[in-house]
């Protein structure tokens, strides 16, 4: 009985220590998620204006650009998977990987797939299964910079422009997590290359800026706000690489906010579970202690009665 009580107390102390760790991680994630949300919002106006400018140029440029050229029969496609570098974030990384696997399964019967990974969790997943990884980046999943996005975008553009016979790709798809709220983060798939210039209002940053008078303007109306020097084609040559880097950067920021939100929820759930387990172990320890005391009293009373019976009678 004493050993059982000691084990319960040791386990309770261990759970209490774990609770302190998960509580600290919950508070850290909670404090960082505010900064991540503000960063996403701050990046929105630039992304929106870049999309508007690109839409305006594209509407007045009839020449086809290499980054917008669609191959009717793609032979090789790439999938960029954005996950976290660390665990303890619930199902955040596994949801992204599952979505990427579904995309790969859909594409694979028709073409070869090149895998680009961002985040150690994705790298560990693919390396554990012995699958080939063409490019990988890690170390900045929860605090990405534009420089990180630019590095990724440069590799993507380089591979897209390279012929497939030399290891290039015809299409590049990106799988990331879109931050909708603290409670909702949704894995999303977009085709990054070849570029399809969309209405700014259809982009996530355009939806964030809903209500802006300029958001609903069409390309013809937007055109009158700009002069293209030396000509629209040259401007398009400069804008398209910036647009690719911006899309990657915005996806990294969305993923970082989603990762922190998932970690905050996971650590809160772990802290709550630890508290419940501590209460259960405390109750079991008290019951074991009461049982031990009752047993000791019973033994004392029984021993006293036995002594009384064995004592000589006068």
Curated annotation (Swiss-Prot):
It is found in: Cell membrane. The lineage of its organism: Bacteria, Bacillati, Actinomycetota, Actinomycetes, Propionibacteriales. Transmembrane segments: none annotated. CDD domains: F1-ATPase_gamma. This is ATP synthase gamma chain. One of its GO terms (molecular function) is proton-transporting ATP synthase activity, rotational mechanism. Produces ATP from ADP in the presence of a proton gradient across the membrane. The gamma chain is believed to be important in regulating ATPase activity and the flow of protons through the CF(0) complex. The gene is atpG. Pfam families: ATP-synt. It comes from the Bacteria.
């Amino acid at each position: 009985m004493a050993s059982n009580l000691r084990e319960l107390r040791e386990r309770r102390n261990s759970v209490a220590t774990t609770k302190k760790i998960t509580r600290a991680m919950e508070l850290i994630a909670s404090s960082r998620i505010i900064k991540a949300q503000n960063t996403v919002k701050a990046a929105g106006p630039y992304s929106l204006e870049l999309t508007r400018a690109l839409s305006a140029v594209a509407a007045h440029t009839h020449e086809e650009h290499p980054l917008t050229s669609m191959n009717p029969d793609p032979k090789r496609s790439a999938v960029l998977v954005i996950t976290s570098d660390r665990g303890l974030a619930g199902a955040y990384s596994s949801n992204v990987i599952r979505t990427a696997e579904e995309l790969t399964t859909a594409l694979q019967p028709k073409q070869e797939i090149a895998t680009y990974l961002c985040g150690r969790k994705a790298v560990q997943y693919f390396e554990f299964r012995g699958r080939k990884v063409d490019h990988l980046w890690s170390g900045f999943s929860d605090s990405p910079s534009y420089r990180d996005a630019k590095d990724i975008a440069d590799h993507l553009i380089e591979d897209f422009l390279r012929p497939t016979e030399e290891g290039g790709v015809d299409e590049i798809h990106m799988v990331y997590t879109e931050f909708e709220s603290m409670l909702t983060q949704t894995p999303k798939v977009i085709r990054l290359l070849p570029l399809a210039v969309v209405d700014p209002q259809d982009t996530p940053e355009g939806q964030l800026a809903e209500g802006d008078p300029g958001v609903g303007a069409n390309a013809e109306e937007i055109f009158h706000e700009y002069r293209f020097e030396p000509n629209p084609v040259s401007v398009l040559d400069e804008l398209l690489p910036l647009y690719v880097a911006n899309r990657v950067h915005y996806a990294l920021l969305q993923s970082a906010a989603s990762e922190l939100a998932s970690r905050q929820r996971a650590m809160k759930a772990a802290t709550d579970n630890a508290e419940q387990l501590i209460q259960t172990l405390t109750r079991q320890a008290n019951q074991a202690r009461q049982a031990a005391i009752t047993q000791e009293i019973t033994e004392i009373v029984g021993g006293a009665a036995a002594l009384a019976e064995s004592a000589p009678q006068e």
